[in-house]
């Protein structure tokens, strides 16, 4: 999960949402245990003024940003947890992949995440339930009786809670392949 700044009005020309926080957990597909994590703030380079407003909303302080890492270092941390073709990159919604891809493009760095490894758990949950709307992460964890923690809308806590929901769904017998098969059928 990433925290980024998005604002509809008053954006500079060419504006894109910069990642200002990353949170990730790595879950072993067999044991369903957490085997790694990332929790860092990320320096905004292109739109620091706009990022400041996003930091205020997400309760990120200037002191937090003193320990922030560079975008390229964040990608290296992702590479340490993610093995292309062998690891799913799971997030709640499709925006996380898009914001990483755009950040890579703007920084002129290679995106370490393959699009075919990206799993939008919100879309998968929607299909699993047969809903016509997308459920929010908080409501989905409540529906599945997942014991959540931390603050909502902070990158690491959202990643940890998404991971807990994924583990619950997998433990209940859900398979990610079922999502891709069903999604492919819908797009025929």
Give a label for each model feature:
Residues 42-43, 48-58, 62-65, 122-159:
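Active-site-proximal helix-loop-helix substrate-binding element of RNase H-like nuclease domains
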Residues 95-117:
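Substrate-recognition/cap helix-loop segment adjacent to the acidic, metal-dependent catalytic center
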Residues 103-107, 127, 143, 165-172:
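Active-site catalytic microenvironments for nucleophilic, acid-base chemistry
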Residues 94, 114-121, 151-159, 179-182:
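Short, surface-exposed recognition loops or helix-turn segments adjacent to catalytic cores
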Residues 1-4, 123, 161:
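Short, glycine/acidic-enriched loop or turn micro-motifs at the edges of active sites
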Residues 98, 160-163:
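A structural signal for well-ordered alpha-helical segments within the folded catalytic domains
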Residues 1-97, 112, 142-143:
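Conserved non-catalytic scaffold segment of RNase H-like nuclease domains
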Residues 165-188:
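Acidic two-metal-ion nuclease catalytic site recognized across multiple nuclease folds
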């Amino acid at each position: 999960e990433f925290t980024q700044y998005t604002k509809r009005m008053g954006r500079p020309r060419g504006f894109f949402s910069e990642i200002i926080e990353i949170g990730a957990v790595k879950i072993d597909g067999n044991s369903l245990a957490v085997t790694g994590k990332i929790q860092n703030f990320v320096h905004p380079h292109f739109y620091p003024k706009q990022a400041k407003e996003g930091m205020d909303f997400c309760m990120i302080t200037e002191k937090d940003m003193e320990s922030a890492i560079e975008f390229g270092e964040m990608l290296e941390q992702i590479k340490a947890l993610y093995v292309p073709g062998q690891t799913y990159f799971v997030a709640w919604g499709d925006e996380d992949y898009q914001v990483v891809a755009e950040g890579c493009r703007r920084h002129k760095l290679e995106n370490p995440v393959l699009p075919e490894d990206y799993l939008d758990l919100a879309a998968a949950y929607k299909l699993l339930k047969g809903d016509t709307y997308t459920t929010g992460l908080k409501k989905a964890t409540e529906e599945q009786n997942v014991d959540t923690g931390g603050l909502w809308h902070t990158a690491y806590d959202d990643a940890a809670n998404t991971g807990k929901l994924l583990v619950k769904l997998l433990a209940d017998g859900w398979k990610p392949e079922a999502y891709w098969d069903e999604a492919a059928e819908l797009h025929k």
